[in-house]
Amino acid sequence: MKIDPNKEKALNAVLGQIEKQFGKGSIMKLGEDRSMDVETISTGSLALDVALGAGGLPMGRIVEIYGPESSGKTTLTLEVIAAAQKQGKTCAFIDAEHALDPIYAKKLGVDIDNLLCSQPDTGEQALEICDALTRSGAVDVIVVDSVAALTPKAEIEGEIGDSHMGLAARMMSQAMRKLAGNLKQSNTLLIFINQIRMKIGVMFGNPETTTGGNALKFYASVRLDIRRTGAIKDREEVIGNETRVKVVKNKIAAPFKQAEFQILYGQGINSTGELVDLGVQHKLIEKAGAWYSYKGDKIGQGRANAGKYLIENPAISDEIETTLRAMLLGNGEKVSADSADTAGDNIDLETGEVF
């Protein structure tokens, strides 16, 4: 498409002004084939890392992960913590819901002996702890579970039934203003888990909204909408969930991508199954009938056995993952078998949410 030279000059000038005023990545072309040069931490899902465009969640930023109950929100954050700890990073978990299961966290690969954990009494206390950890510069990843459980002190000290209109929203708004700059200075990743509520009286459009007001929506560099789309069965027994994650906001790469993966009960994200699928799609792994082969050697009959082979042979698994990351992220390719553009979806112009 040809653009008038004068208009192009004016456009470049205003884009430069916007980036200078609001920071790099505040505006970009939707199809632009680049991502911000930021340090990232893997989500545990290669498809989601690709959908994010930068290879994972960005350091020094605020991330919001929201979805219905039992959709995999906490599991996803624990996978991020496990990946960060493998890189030698220090992580903290602010358990406002008082529901963290250390046994499950350990199964997902989290080093619970070195994971900092706090169960605050009030929302203000939780956010002050976040701020103190951030300003220390010693903590790399902080997870808050969840925004809905950050109860203002006035509400806790009051009686059930008392009206506390807008208290949580004001508390979150003040915290965001305080935290955003400190996170950038200390290069700390702050992840908020959030719950979904329904707006009353919405006749058209999406009635869903998240708790804690609008401040978090604006301050978050990445917002992920996670949903359970189906059940994984072994004969009659349900052993996991089919999961879809939509990147509804992304300030480090183009947004509105999505990824699909499996979460297995007691194991977390089925990363080896994902490697098999992506390997076949990108012709890294050969599939002949039910048999899967890698570099001429058979690795298993059926997807489950091929995945089991990769678990038993971590060196080969790492080699396949490294090659896939170079193919999908190194040359800018952003769409995979499990990540697709959602341009056909409806977009809430006020919040930027896809529904």
From Swiss-Prot:
Gene3D superfamilies: P-loop containing nucleotide triphosphate hydrolases. One of its GO terms (molecular function) is damaged DNA binding. Disulfide bonds: none annotated. It is found in: Cytoplasm. PROSITE patterns: RECA_1 (PS00321), RECA_2 (PS50162), RECA_3 (PS50163). Keywords: ATP-binding, Cytoplasm, DNA damage, DNA recombination, DNA repair, DNA-binding, Nucleotide-binding, SOS response. Its main location: cytoplasm. One of its GO terms (biological process) is DNA recombination. ATP binds at G67, P68, E69, S70, S71, G72, K73, T74. InterPro entries: AAA+_ATPase, DNA_recomb/repair_RecA, DNA_recomb/repair_RecA_CS, P-loop_NTPase, RecA-like_C, RecA-like_N, RecA_ATP-bd, RecA_C_sf. It holds the Pfam family RecA. One of its GO terms (cellular component) is cytosol. The keyword DNA-binding applies. SUPFAM superfamilies: P-loop containing nucleoside triphosphate hydrolases, RecA protein, C-terminal domain. Belongs to the RecA family. Can catalyze the hydrolysis of ATP in the presence of single-stranded DNA, the ATP-dependent uptake of single-stranded DNA by duplex DNA, and the ATP-dependent hybridization of homologous single-stranded DNAs. It interacts with LexA causing its activation and leading to its autocatalytic cleavage. This is Protein RecA. It comes from Shewanella pealeana (strain ATCC 700345 / ANG-SQ1). The lineage of its organism: Bacteria, Pseudomonadati, Pseudomonadota, Gammaproteobacteria, Alteromonadales. The gene is recA.
